[in-house]
Amino acid sequence: FRKKYKNSLNNPDSKKIFNLKNIVSPFILRRTKNEVLTELPEKVENNMIVELSKEQKKLYMAYVKRAKKELRGFNKEENNNLKVLAILTKLRQICNSPQLFDENYTGEVAKIELLREMIPDILENGHRMIIFSQFLGTLEEIREELEKENVEYFYIDGSIKSKERMEISKKFNSGEGQVVLISLKAGGTGLNLTGADVVIHYDPWWNFAVENQASDRAHRIGQKKSVQVIKLITEGTIEEKIIKIQENKRALSENILGKDSGNNKDSKEIFEMDEKELMELLSFEK
């Protein structure tokens, strides 16, 4: 399979991809959410591009320089997965919560500054919201901001038991609270939070299907309003590269399986990259 199709995977118009779709389609019976739940309100997705603060940009560029030195001579055949993942995670931390990367960081954080403007405006217009992040430290920072502004919220991470999650869901959907903060992996499935009509993904994840499942905590049976999904993306950084990987993966899935396809496994593309591809992933483009 890899020998025959791998080089065609990034080209959705490839004849080989068309042939692959014809091969697998007789064995797949799929009914997408859009086909089954035609009565659901609209879901509108938008990427909001955020410029790093001056201090963040300086920190980001310094670490990129260091990371490139560490990866020079990289051989994807060697078991360097943990090293690559650690480097990319640190870059993502700088984009979202620089204090997680450097506890002495005291500069501005672009996304937090944006949230300070967004949240009051969203709530004052009668909306209620879910905010997802993969970093517990980031959720804590957002939590502090909500408390400063006296915003009523619920919080869910992996430590919250199923019974308590269901209780939070019940309270929120009955009108209690204005915001639910959720770690992406803890809240990706099983929760009904149709009391929210705005979903914010504070930091992007490699696999679009995981984010879609999280967004669908609000966009599901019982939702009466259109749902707005907002992804916060720092300009020129690893986050824009993640979005590109998401889009490529989505296009491939849709070409082979059809619209709304995808699985919930984390993307492994980064572990198949060679040194040149990793250097491009690390580059700051603006």
Enumerate the predicted regions with their spans.
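Conserved protein kinase catalytic domain
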Residues: R2-K6, K21, L88, R92, ...
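Conserved P-loop NTPase motor "coupling/switch" region that bridges the ATPase
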Residues: F1-K33, Q223
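SF2 helicase/translocase ATPase core recognition
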Residues: L37-K65, E164, V179-K265
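Conserved Helicase C-terminal RecA-like lobe
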Residues: E35-M61, F74-L191, S261-G262, K268-K286
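A structural signal for short hydrophobic/aromatic patches embedded in well-ordered alpha helices
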Residues: F1, I17-L20, L59-Y63, I168-S169, ...
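Generic recognition of well-ordered alpha-helical segments
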Residues: N19, I23, F27, L59, ...
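Hydrophobic aliphatic residues
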Residues: Y5, F27-I28, V64, C95, ...
